[in-house]
Amino acid sequence: LQGFICVIGVLELPVFVTLRPGFWQFSPMRTRRSATEQLPADELFRSRLENQIDLRHPLVQLSHRLPWSALEQALSPRLPATTGTGGRPALPVRLIAGLLYLKHAYDLSDEAVCERWLENPYWQFFTGEVVFQTCVPCDPSSLTRWRQRLGEAGMEELLAHTINTAHAIKAVDARELSRVIVDTTVQEKAIAHPTDSRLLEVARKKLVLLAKRHGIALRQTYARQGPALRRKAGRYAHARQFKRMRKVLRRQRTLLGRGLRDLQRKLAQQEPSVRERISVWLERAQRLLAQRPKDKQKLYALHAPEVECMSKGKARQPYEFGVKVGIAVSARKGLIVGARSFPGNPYDGDTLAEQLEQARGLLQDVDVIPQVAIVDLGYRGRDVEGVQILHRGQAKTLTRRQWRWIKRRQAVEPVIGHLKQDCRLNRCHLKGTQGDALHVLGCAAGYNLRWLLRWIACLRAWLQVVRARSSTPSSTMWPANMALEV
């Protein structure tokens, strides 16, 4: 025992602390104990959440059916190890996983999901709280660090456990999960629409800011002429005076080149650490200065060089700027069984093997292997070993049953639409290629959560109808020839 004095008011009380064996050794990441372990069965002044809310609510029912303990065991190896005195314990895994589920299921930002959690007792119950909390669960920036800790494999676990839950409650069976529909779409990045005049002006401002931050005096910053040229280029483009617009763009390139060369000359006198920090932006500015409208692999955003330009043939939006993502859904009920990003804008057929490999990994807990993949003509010319590929280009060899499955191919389109409008897939705010990969997996997990909530609500409504029908004579309420539908 090691003792010390604790001063409480004017009293000095000896306090004894027992150091457990291995106190200073490294151990797996410590997490805060769950609310059920910290609080007694009941309190005098605070009522438990289960006594205040409707336990038949779909979110409450789903919280009882999600395998939280299995999810914690799957995510624990991916969390960093800490020492016994590593500061405050980390937040519970269930709390973070629940917030990530709710964020994408209800189309909210990190800040908004924490604020809504504070107001909603059902959300607090879903994340494992026992009594109503009156402070936010965590700082919104903690969700960013947790996403980085989990990585792509951890986010895949969140998606896989929604599939396991759907199979466990018999919302889908194994035979339905063996047939999947695969399609690709574009996950747009949170950038402004790229125009030459805007990009050149942004690069000039960035170089001036870097020089000022590190105490480098440039000969000229063009603080007045740069914004004026950008506005002038926009007016000329709107008036379709393209010859004048191109003249303004040449002038903007001249100003950017002058500032770039001036900064490069004076950077040689700086410390190596300063040169290393600025060299990244100098390379991007040089790349922007050299590119032309017809070039390939252009730079579309100074802060996001991974952004690519893709054309999907949409009349209202000919070009989209982001990354290609693949979506795999069950052929009959539309449950997402695979979602991943494909940097580099590859041919759709070249993504099929990787997409089905991911789906196979996500379905391994339910002991299902995708056997049939229904695709569009963009996947022609590619085969995957062990999987039957169906598309309408095989018209002469298809059976009538296979044609019926091909007619289900367009069922993936509304799933993609709901992913974009309801689950935040239409705009990715996360940084880099890793952010693109994490975001699409979070959107898919949020969509599956909405799918499960909808299934539970429909089941409850169906049971209410059956109960009402059994308690009411069929001759008075239900005609004999009326089918029971939900």
Residues covered by each model-derived region:
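Basic, low-complexity intrinsically disordered segments
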Residues: 30-32, 74, 78-97, 104-170
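Charged, often Cys/His-bearing segments associated with DNA-binding zinc-finger transcription factors
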Residues: 2-77, 452-486
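Helix-centered, glycine/charged polyanion-binding patches within enzymatic domains
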Residues: 364-438
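Flexible, glycine/threonine-enriched loop-and-boundary segments that flank and lead into catalytic domains
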Residues: 301-320
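Secondary-structure capping and boundary motifs in well-ordered enzyme cores
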Residues: 51, 67, 87-95, 135-138, ...
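Short, conserved catalytic/metal-binding motifs centered on acidic residues
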Residues: 57, 97-99, 113-117, 137-143, ...
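Active-site- or DNA-interface-adjacent structural scaffold in DNA-acting proteins
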Residues: 17, 130-306
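Electropositive, glycine- and tryptophan-enriched low-complexity nucleic-acid-binding patches
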Residues: 314-362
